[in-house]
Regions:
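N-terminal cap/lid segment of alpha/beta-hydrolase-fold proteins
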Residues: 7-50
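Short, surface-exposed "cap/lid" segments of acyl-processing enzymes
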Residues: 47-100
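Short beta-to-alpha linker loops that shape the active-site pocket of alpha/beta-hydrolase fold enzymes
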Residues: 94-98, 170, 281
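Alpha/beta-hydrolase active-site loop
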Residues: 109-129
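Alpha/beta-hydrolase-fold enzymes
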Residues: 129-133, 137-138, 142-229
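Short beta-strand/loop motif that positions the catalytic acidic residue
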Residues: 241, 247-249
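Short alpha-helix in the alpha/beta-hydrolase fold that links the catalytic acid
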Residues: 257-267
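Catalytic active-site module of serine/aspartate enzymes centered on a nucleophile-bearing elbow/loop
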Residues: 274-333
C-alpha cells in the first residue's frame, strides 16, 4: 500500500462520513524511537460540504487515562468538531497504547520524555506536510505537560507551532513525602511491580497508563528532581520559547490547581501569554473542574468560544515548502 506521507510510512486506516463531518484516521509508523514498533493514530476532522480548502490546522492532545473521545464524542460533540465546524483543520492525536494507537513492545516503560522527543515532532511534521501550514497545538492535562516538555526540550520550535494552549496542565504541585528519599524509594519499588495503572479500576478514565509515566513523575517531584531529562532541562528551556501561549485553569480543579498552571505559563519566555481561570469569581457560571472545563454544556457555551477567539486572533500559519522528516526519521522512497 502506498504511504500517505513522503516522510515515513503512513496508512489511511479509515475514511468515514460522520453526520456533517468527514473523519480520516491515519496510522503513523515513523520508526524514529528506540522502539521500532511504535505506531500512532491521528484522526483528521473536516466538514462534508467544505467548499473551500481546509483551514488552519489545530492539533489536539488528550491527557492521561484518555483518548481521542475526550475531544470528539461518537455523536460528533466536542471541542474537535466545534473547531472543525468553525473552519479549522482539526487533528486529534492519540498517544502510544491509547485509543486507536496500539501498544508498542516497550509500552510499560513509555514516558513523557518519549512522547515529547519522538512522537510530537513526527505528528507535527505529518500535519504540516498534509496541510501546508504551521499548526496550533492544544493540550489537556498530561497532553499539555507533554507539549510543554517538547517545547522546553526544543523538540518543537517556532517552525512547528503557531501557538500553544494548555488546559489544566502543571508540574509544580507535589506531595511532600516524595521529597523524603526512603518514601520515594519505596514508592518506586512498589510501582515497578506493575505494568500499568488502571484507569477503569481507579475511576480515572477509559485508558490505562504505563507505569513508566508514573515513575517519571515521581522523579520530577523527588528530592533534587526537576521537570526534564538528565541531559535536557525542560523547565529552564521554556524561557527560550517565544510562541503565543494560553494557559487555562479551573477554579474547582484540585488535581491541577490554578496557581500551579499559572507557574507553568510564567516559565515561558513569550511576550504573548494569557492566563484564564474558569470560576464564578471570573464571571463564569460555575467553578469548573479538571474535566468539565472542556467536557460539559457549560464549557460548550462559555469555554469553547474563548478557545475559538484565541485561535482566530493568532496569525494564520504560512504556506510551507515540502516538509523534511524530523531528526531520526528516514524519508520514504
Amino acid at each position: 500500500m502506498q504511504s500517505s506521507s513522503s516522510l515515513f510510512p503512513v496508512a489511511l486506516m479509515s475514511a468515514e462520513r460522520r453526520g456533517d463531518l468527514v473523519e480520516d484516521v491515519y496510522r503513523l509508523k515513523p520508526g524514529n524511537s528506540p522502539d521500532a514498533t511504535v505506531e500512532l493514530a491521528v484522526t483528521r476532522l473536516g466538514l462534508v460540504d467544505q467548499a473551500r480548502p481546509r483551514g488552519v490546522p489545530v492539533i489536539l492532545l488528550h491527557g492521561s487515562f484518555s483518548n481521542r473521545r475526550f475531544w470528539y464524542s461518537p455523536k460528533g460533540i466536542g471541542l474537535g468538531p466545534y473547531l472543525a465546524r468553525a473552519g479549522f483543520d482539526v487533528w486529534i492525536a492519540e498517544m502510544r497504547g491509547h485509543g486507536l494507537s496500539a501498544r508498542n513492545a516497550t509500552w510499560r516503560t513509555n514516558k513523557v520524555a518519549d512522547y515529547a522527543r519522538y512522537d510530537l515532532p513526527v505528528i507535527g511534521a505529518f500535519v504540516k506536510e498534509l496541510s501546508g501550514q504551521v499548526p496550533h497545538w492544544i493540550g489537556h492535562s498530561l497532553g499539555g505537560t507533554t507539549l510543554a516538555a517538547a517545547l522546553g526540550g526544543q523538540y518543537l520550535g517556532e517552525s512547528d507551532a503557531a501557538s500553544v494552549a494548555l488546559f489544566g496542565s502543571q508540574v509544580s504541585r507535589y506531595y511532600w513525602p516524595l521529597k523524603i528519599p526512603p518514601v520515594q524509594w519505596a514508592g518506586r519499588l512498589l510501582l515497578r511491580s506493575f505494568e500499568h495503572i488502571s484507569g477503569s479500576r481507579f475511576k480515572r478514565g477509559p485508558e490505562d497508563e504505563p507505569v513508566g509515566v508514573a515513575l517519571e513523575s515521581m522523579r520530577w517531584h523527588g528530592l533534587f528532581g526537576r521537570f526534564g531529562e538528565r541531559d535536557n532541562h525542560w523547565w529552564a528551556g521554556l524561557a527560550n520559547v517565544r510562541l503565543p501561549v494560553l494557559a487555562v485553569a479551573a477554579e474547582g480543579d484540585h488535581q491541577d490547581p490554578p496557581w500551579a498552571c499559572r507557574l507553568l505559563l510564567e516559565r515561558f519566555g513569550s511576550g504573548q501569554r494569557q492566563f484564564l481561570s474558569l470560576g464564578r469569581r471570573q464571571g463564569f457560571s460555575e467553578d469548573f473542574d479538571h474535566v468539565r472545563m472542556l467536557i460539559s454544556t457549560a464549557a460548550q457555551e462559555q469555554v469553547w468560544p474563548r478557545v475559538l477567539d484565541w485561535l482566530q486572533q493568532r496569525p494564520v500559519g504560512e504556506s510551507l515548502p515540502a516538509a523534511e522528516p524530523p531528526q531520526g526519521v528516514a524519508a520514504e522512497t
